[in-house]
Amino acid sequence: MAASVQPRQFGHLEPGSAPVRGAASSNGAKAYPPANGIPRRADSPVRGCGFPPLVSPPPRKPPSDGSDDEEEEQEDWRELYGSHLQLEVEPPVRDARDEGTADAWIERNPSLIRLTGKHPLNCEPPLARLMHHGFITPAALHYVRNHGAVPRGDWSTWTVDVTGLVKRPMRLTMDELVNGFPAVEIPVTLVCAGNRRKEQNMVQQTVGFNWGAAGVSTSVWRGARLRDVLRRCGIMPSKGGALNVCFEGAEDLPGGGGSKYGTSITRQWALDPSRDIMLAYMQNGEPLLPDHGFPVRAIIPGCIGGRMVKWVKRIIVTTAESDNYYHYKDNRVLPSHVDAELANADAWWYKPEYIINELNVNSVITTPGHDEILPINGITTQRGYTMKGYAYSGGGKRITRVEVTLDGGETWLVCVLDLPEKPTKYGKHWCWCFWSVEVEVLDLLGAKEIAVRAWDQSHNTQPEKLIWNLMGMMNNCWFKVKVNVCRPHKGEIGLVFEHPTQPGNQTGGWMARQKHLETAEAAAPGLKRSTSTPFMNTTDGKQFTMSEVRKHSSQDSAWIVVHGHVYDCTAFLKDHPGGADSILINAGTDCTEEFDAIHSDKAKALLDTYRIGELITTGAGYSSDNSVHGASNLSQLAPIREAIKAPAPVALSSPRDKVPCQLVDKKELSRDVRLFRFALPSSDQVLGLPVGKHIFVCASIEGKLCMRAYTPTSMVDEVGHFDLLIKVYFKNEHPKFPDGGLMTQYLDSLPVGAYIDVKGPLGHVEYTGRGEFVINGKPRNARRLAMIAGGSGITPMYQVIQSVLRDQPEDTTEMHLVYANRTEDDILLRDELDRWAAEYPDRLKVWYVIDQVKRPEEGWKYGVGFVTEEVLREHVPEGGDDTLALACGPPPMIKFAVSPNLEKMKYDMANSFIVF
């Protein structure tokens, strides 16, 4: 929130006792009849969420603050959202993908297309399903944009604070919001600013995930006008500095090192009666669903969804606009030349001219659908074909015309508009409309592409070509559908229609195909035909089904699918920096999301060397979003099953499974060091991580999967939990990394009770005890260990040291540790290392190296500077057949300090030097 004023002392802090209709139930809660007489199923999502059904608000009455608004007759929208709307939607269910997450309690519609993996939920309905329901979208099918876990709201205890530059700060209960203010009920189309973003990602990857063309929905919203609430609280005049109204939600989010979701609008907007801004508590005649902001959210018609804060807890009137992390680092359209590095370096995020508020004009072709086939025969050519779609604009502007072209814009057909919405008394149009046009089938037969564009009442229209921007927002270029000739049946021809993309990680779309061709053409001149580049020989026209890919899931044949391409990575198993397990964990699967989460652009370019063909999507039997697969003939690894509890006593029963683990304790050991304890799914389980291996911690951060490797510090036989020691890299502390560590800041922001997913074991090194290692599947014995660690790279060394010392006196392995850090305060696990070195002087010798001494008066007795040849010669043994060097730390340290100096010390760098 903007920090221009301090919150004022509340004059009305205690929840009030505004009268609410209804009798007391047996459990003491208020009992209410169903809203609008609509019966609710026993499994309704409204049940069990800590709130009663709502009655319709009392009859409208003039505001008590002297408002001179002209009262208008409100329309009755019940026929649009009556019982027939609910009956057309299948019952919500608890999705297996939510199991083990903070959203496990929420029931959701199973047809929603998930765009960001398991958690948090970001989804859109299938485009055909969205259009089937017409003007009003059932709440269960409304698109969802969540930044984190859904707060568990309770109607009876929820309050909204209104504070800042107001004369009468208040804390309003939900009953007061419903009964104390006149209700307004209007239909409003909500659109995510990222709608159609996947088209931009096909040109160049943005920082956002893959929205398709269904990030748009329309509901009838009921609530209290924001202006009435602000007037009741006595908003101060603009001359007194009351220029902005900030909203803050209830979620605990990782952005900015931990924050709520917040944003703001101007005072002028907030008080403008023509804008119909409300604090909504009902959607389509029902209380809000949890995903849509229960119990109360902001609705700002004509604006992007990102301004409409859900789960509203605070409204603060301020001088400056919100200073919330998400107000600046989200919902911006930056110039096309600005990439992430430039945006951070030159503070483009904070330039006010690039903020998005009102929607732009947009339109989409929904009929013909993607992969729809139109047979060409004597019957179809005698009648027209009706194309259909939707269109919308922002700021209350009405769509005035929609046009379709079959010849690349040379000529245009004017479409018939269906405008179900009447203008408001101020002449505003807050909803989408639909269009249709009948074309001759023979004209379609001669077309290679069809495109649509819309115009609004200000004569704004859509550009022909896509305009890329870093966040991939406000994409509104012509929506183009390719037309191709096919043979659906023997002896018959037809037309197959191809949309530009498919949402999320679903394969298909002409833009993906076009990008693949461009990539191949660009790569071809520099590639040689050889067995290491098999796609040069076999890609042309080669296609595989997912069932074929699943057969290749072992060391003998390891195939993966990434973005619809099939890759044979068998030849790369021995060369992968993370070991063969890093590939085998995903062999035989579509690992698009996980590959993107942990690989650089260089690695992505290298992957194309191993492309052998394209994936055939075979319908409902396949999902590219890390779906649950059935059994296959794997020799080493089991198939992926997301979030399935492993049988006791080992939690990590398969390196492919994501295991949900709950944060049960968090200790702050220093300013930037945290010790986390995560409970395993069952209290009698051990983690099952061999010494030397690591796990992946997986989380969805800012809508994208993030995965990082960590080695627990707890003992391998610890029952019921494991511990992670994490150094938090905060933003704005290192000039080369202004955003800090994405995962470490996320973990630091997690509240106790939250869940993460872990996968493993992973890694190419395992210590089996008494000097015996297994490295890349081959046994190796060592009597002496040279251990060089930097920063948090101490954790795998710590596991090996711990294992050796627990097996005394049998394990006679000698360990020589050189541990580098910036200062003495950055040394992790120092107390344990010093204690062990003192207790076992014949087994463990420790030498610290730091860049600078912060407290010279304490008498620092170890090294200062860098890890040099001199340091290594003095503190680790010479190379030899019985000596093994283990290293873990920043890549520059390994490359420039460790590797060249160990080579000078006669280490066999191919067989006796291991980097974790």
Curated annotation (Swiss-Prot):
Residues 66-76 have a biased composition (Acidic residues). It is an enzyme of class 1 (oxidoreductase). Residues 541-616 form the Cytochrome b5 heme-binding domain. It catalyses: nitrite + NAD(+) + H2O = nitrate + NADH + H(+). Residues 656-768 form the FAD-binding FR-type domain. Its EC number is 1.7.1.1. FAD binds at residues 708-711, 725-730, 737, 742-744, 792, 795. SMART domains: Cyt-b5. Mo-molybdopterin binds at residue 192. Binds 1 FAD per subunit. Belongs to the nitrate reductase family. Pfam families: Cyt-b5, FAD_binding_6, Mo-co_dimer, NAD_binding_1, Oxidored_molyb. Heme binds at residues 576, 599. The gene is NIA1. This is Nitrate reductase [NADH] 1. Keywords: Disulfide bond, FAD, Flavoprotein, Heme, Iron, Metal-binding, Molybdenum, NAD, Nitrate assimilation, Oxidoreductase. SUPFAM superfamilies: Cytochrome b5-like heme/steroid binding domain (SSF55856), E set domains (SSF81296), Ferredoxin reductase-like, C-terminal NADP-linked domain (SSF52343), Oxidoreductase molybdopterin-binding domain (SSF56524), Riboflavin synthase domain-like (SSF63380). InterPro entries: Cbr1-like_FAD-bd_dom (IPR008333), Cyt_B5-like_heme/steroid-bd (IPR001199), Cyt_B5-like_heme/steroid_sf (IPR036400), Cyt_B5_heme-BS (IPR018506), FAD-bd_FR_type (IPR017927), Flavoprot_Pyr_Nucl_cyt_Rdtase (IPR001709), FNR_nucleotide-bd (IPR039261), Ig_E-set (IPR014756). Its cofactor is FAD; heme; Mo-molybdopterin. Signal peptide: none annotated. PANTHER family: NITRATE REDUCTASE, SULFITE REDUCTASE. GO terms for biological process: nitrate assimilation; nitric oxide biosynthetic process. GO terms for cellular component: organelle membrane.
